């Protein structure tokens, strides 16, 4: 058997395979035995005609397809091994020569894993990013704590105001008919929170407890229930009760109630410390992102289109998955935005290309720098994931397939390599 690499351009390989005539004859015999029962030749019972008669009656080419398939796989695998190629899709096969008693010559064209030519990835200059924590940030967090620890007390002697918590019964009607999901009792709604249908909360303000009234709304065009989008509805609403939040005083007693600290100043100091750490991590992640962008820009790699198309497929599946949490799906999203699937795929192309290139470059650096995942790192990641899923660690491990474990290890290696790149960066202060 002979193999030759005719060309390798833009990560698409064209390989010529020469299969000896005797090997192809073996394939023809295999094809005949496989299909013998299908041949119906006059003068012979079905499946009993000799091969020479079958070829004369149907034509010599009747066995070619299965014969080529029989001999191709072995020759193709040998060629990939010889030229150290890793295919990323199925090959297109072109027959250059075929015939009884002749060597079979095939041409296989296949996109392969691209070779990455790394540029500079050590000593990358990155401008330092810092986020300060201001007094207002601390006060904002304190106010959130107050809201979380507020007492709910009844409102008496006045109509509803913004900020009140209204307890309502309601039933919605479209064209005078009730609709599914449009009815509730003892529903708590904070007025002014903008968490309900637009315009609904505003029309409760000014009404008194035990009052029944109409609320007129129009459902938004992007409403989660497709059947209700853009439709006008009338809700019969009864205001059953009004409550409000009574916020605790910001003092040492408050600090003792909501934390392990004895004084408000200690609580403030802890909040500031946590915000500073949060900002440090956020700033570091942004610098890492900028470093990776520069490293990827410095690298050269010809990426086959099929790898980008597959990344777009993944992005579309993720988009559809997230849309379903909002009561939508990909088709309804396309309808709302007025886009076609083809247009959306085109919009996603550049982002998908960058994601594929980034992954390839990071993988190459990991290989060059011998960055590997230790058993301890894998164990720690599995512990973290099990804790997040609130499942026993051993049970979680047993639930994972080998493919899933490999995927987790790849993620660890990916971020470990990014940490390596960042550790080699030169951080430049803005003043420099």
From Swiss-Prot:
PROSITE patterns, alphabetized: FKBP_PPIASE
Keyword Glycoprotein carried by entry: no
Pfam families hit by this protein: FKBP_C, Trigger_C, Trigger_N
InterPro entries for the chain: PPIase_dom_sf (IPR046357), PPIase_FKBP_dom (IPR001179), Trig_fac (IPR005215), Trigger_fac_C (IPR008880), Trigger_fac_C_sf (IPR037041), Trigger_fac_ribosome-bd_bac (IPR008881), Trigger_fac_ribosome-bd_sf (IPR036611), Trigger_fact/SurA_dom_sf (IPR027304)
Catalyses which reaction(s): [protein]-peptidylproline (omega=180) = [protein]-peptidylproline (omega=0)
Chief location category: cytoplasm
GO cellular component term, pick one: cytoplasm
Subcellular location: Cytoplasm
GO molecular function annotations of the record: peptidyl-prolyl cis-trans isomerase activity; protein folding chaperone; ribosome binding
Enzyme class: isomerase
Sorted UniProt keywords: Cell cycle, Cell division, Chaperone, Cytoplasm, Isomerase, Rotamase
EC code(s) of this entry: 5.2.1.8
NCBIfam families (UniProt xref): tig
Cited PANTHER family: TRIGGER FACTOR CHAPERONE AND PEPTIDYL-PROLYL CIS/TRANS ISOMERASE, TRIGGER FACTOR-LIKE PROTEIN TIG, CHLOROPLASTIC
Record note on domains: Consists of 3 domains; the N-terminus binds the ribosome, the middle domain has PPIase activity, while the C-terminus has intrinsic chaperone activity on its own.
Role: Involved in protein export. Acts as a chaperone by maintaining the newly synthesized protein in an open conformation. Functions as a peptidyl-prolyl cis-trans isomerase.
Protein family according to the UniProt entry: Belongs to the FKBP-type PPIase family. Tig subfamily.
Protein name: Trigger factor
Species lineage: Bacteria, Bacillati, Bacillota, Clostridia, Thermoanaerobacterales
């Amino acid at each position: 058997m002979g193999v030759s690499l005719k060309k390798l351009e833009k990560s698409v390989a064209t390989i010529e395979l020469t299969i000896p005539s005797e090997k192809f004859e073996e394939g023809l015999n295999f094809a005949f035995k496989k299909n013998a029962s299908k041949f119906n030749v006059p003068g012979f019972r079905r499946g009993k005609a000799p091969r020479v008669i079958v070829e004369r009656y149907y034509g010599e080419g009747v066995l070619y397809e299965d014969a080529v398939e029989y001999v191709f796989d072995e020759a193709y695998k040998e060629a990939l091994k010889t030229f150290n190629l890793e295919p990323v899709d199925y090959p297109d096969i072109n027959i250059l020569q075929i015939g009884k008693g002749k060597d079979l010559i095939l041409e296989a064209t296949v996109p392969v894993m691209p070779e990455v030519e790394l540029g500079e990835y050590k000593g990358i200059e990155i401008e330092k990013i810092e986020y300060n924590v201001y007094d207002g940030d601390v006060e904002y967090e304190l106010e959130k704590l107050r809201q979380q620890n507020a007492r709910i007390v009844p409102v008496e002697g006045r109509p509803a105001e913004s900020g009140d918590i209204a307890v309502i019964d309601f039933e919605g009607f479209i064209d005078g008919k009730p609709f599914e999901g449009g009815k509730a009792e003892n529903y708590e709604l904070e007025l002014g929170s903008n968490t309900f249908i637009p315009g609904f909360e505003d029309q409760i303000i000014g009404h008194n407890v035990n009052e029944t009234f109409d609320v007129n709304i129009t459902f938004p065009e992007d409403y989660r229930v497709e059947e209700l989008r853009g439709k006008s509805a009338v809700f019969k609403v009864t205001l059953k009760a009004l409550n409000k939040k009574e916020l605790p005083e910001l003092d040492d007693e408050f600090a003792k109630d909501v934390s392990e600290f004895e004084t408000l100043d200690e609580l403030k100091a802890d909040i500031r410390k946590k915000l500073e750490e949060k900002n440090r991590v956020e700033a570091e992640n942004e610098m890492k992102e900028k470093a990776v962008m520069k490293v990827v820009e410095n690298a050269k790699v010809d990426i086959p289109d099929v790898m980008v198309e597959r990344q777009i497929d993944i992005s579309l599946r993720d988009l559809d998955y997230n849309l379903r949490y909002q009561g939508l799906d990909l088709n309804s999203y396309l309808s709302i935005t007025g886009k076609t699937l083809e247009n959306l795929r085109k919009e996603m192309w550049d982002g998908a290309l960058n994601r594929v290139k980034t992954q390839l470059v990071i993988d190459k650096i990991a290989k060059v720098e011998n960055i590997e995942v230790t058993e301890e790192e894998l164990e720690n990641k599995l512990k973290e994931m099990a804790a997040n899923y609130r499942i026993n660690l051993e049970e979680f491990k047993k639930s994972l397939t080998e493919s899933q474990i490999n995927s987790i290890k790849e993620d660890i290696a990916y971020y470990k390599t990014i940490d390596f790149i960042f550790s080699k960066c030169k951080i430049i202060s803005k003043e420099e």
